[in-house]
């Protein structure tokens, strides 16, 4: 929208300091208001790279956050648009994640878990009173106001939150984090406020024993468990939990959303409002130990996803945050060829990166937030829930990564080490079958294969790239994951095919993309003859 003068209110009123977190199109930095010296966290969104739909989502997030003023919610203090950037000024919360704080405590009891869920329910009740559904309640979004003992729990990240009409149920799209999704969302039924209560039930279960009620490495099996409400209270860890706590979990994890307890009702449950007499005060050391392992798994898997972005079921997976690639068959004049196959339509497994980081944290959930709908809560659209409109600039950058990856593979097929080195960083790191599981750094290891095998190969090689998934990481980094089929003629003149699952991390320096890390599983990419 055209304006006569450029707004500089954020620049005038606030001073920026160190970075606290970063996303694809946003960065979070500590800032201080010049007139009061009060500290805040500024989420800075690069609006030049946002599509019209992303602008709608940004406006919705700001609109929702402006409504919510509660001691257990990270508060939005200001929303400012300047030329090319939008600033969301939030509370600066310094206590870290609730779950990380619990494992550092010397004493933790059922009563403490009750106090935690009480605060979470207070925040959920407040947003539900304002006809808001969070849709992404999980440990990463439960923060502590400070590092002081007894600091308030704060609910963060309203990037997936939606506005609803009272108790009315509707289909707002498939969004959330797998382990915390409700049965009605998985069934693609109309849903509403009860989805947040289901997630609270999962969180409460973890708070009491340190592990989740539903878990399976196979996401399809995980979803089957959730839809069936297949959880229990196994011995011995649940033997010391009071019946009242189990009763509240059962009411929260009720499959039928119409019969599920509400936030207001849960706040009146004896285990919550009469914790001093109902909840056990016994120290739960086993829970702390299990929760420590649970946190470690979350961080480890989050780190792996952040750097590798590869699915265990890669050939069946479909990242529905990415539209189908536009590339067709790429024919080369050389003896090698690279053929790009667009993404599969297989819907058995879904792997998606988090669409937006929490405004005040950087940790990622191992079961990352997934969004598979076109409207993402913008009501009135009849578009398919399996498509997403992407920013045009983002599409162009993804195509750039696919193209440069094809060029690199063509250089390998042609045995052209000079062309290969121009596309790779001199300090390229790699995990590949030829290195027997060792991390290789630099070009010498690869040079051996170029000089002794690839450059001497006169037989044709044809490569097909299947299901390329490109993830843009900030302005100058990207990751591509794909399956590579290599067809070649062996020493006896027989046609052969080898398959490998590959990931390449790219970094742009001085306007040029360089491959900085490579990960390969399966058969060697360069077939031995």
From Swiss-Prot:
Residues 324-353 are annotated as: Disordered. It catalyses: L-seryl-[protein] + ATP = O-phospho-L-seryl-[protein] + ADP + H(+); L-threonyl-[protein] + ATP = O-phospho-L-threonyl-[protein] + ADP + H(+). The modification Phosphothreonine is found at residues 287, 306-307. The active site is at 136 (proton acceptor). Disulfide bonds: none annotated. Keywords: ATP-binding, Calmodulin-binding, Developmental protein, Differentiation, Kinase, Membrane, Neurogenesis, Nucleotide-binding, Phosphoprotein, Sarcoplasmic reticulum, Serine/threonine-protein kinase, Transferase. Its main location: membrane. One of its GO terms (cellular component) is postsynaptic density. It comes from the Eukaryota. The CAMK2 protein kinases contain a unique C-terminal subunit association domain responsible for oligomerization. This is Calcium/calmodulin-dependent protein kinase type II subunit gamma. Its EC number is 2.7.11.17. CAMK2 is composed of 4 different chains: alpha (CAMK2A), beta (CAMK2B), gamma (CAMK2G), and delta (CAMK2D). The different isoforms assemble into homo- or heteromultimeric holoenzymes composed of 12 subunits with two hexameric rings stacked one on top of the other. Activated by Ca(2+)/calmodulin. Binding of calmodulin results in conformational change that relieves intrasteric autoinhibition and allows autophosphorylation of Thr-287 which turns the kinase in a constitutively active form and confers to the kinase a Ca(2+)-independent activity. It is a peripheral membrane protein. Residues 294-316 are annotated as: Calmodulin-binding. CDD domains: STKc_CaMKII. It is found in: Sarcoplasmic reticulum membrane. The modification Phosphoserine is found at residues 311, 334, 349, 352, 455.
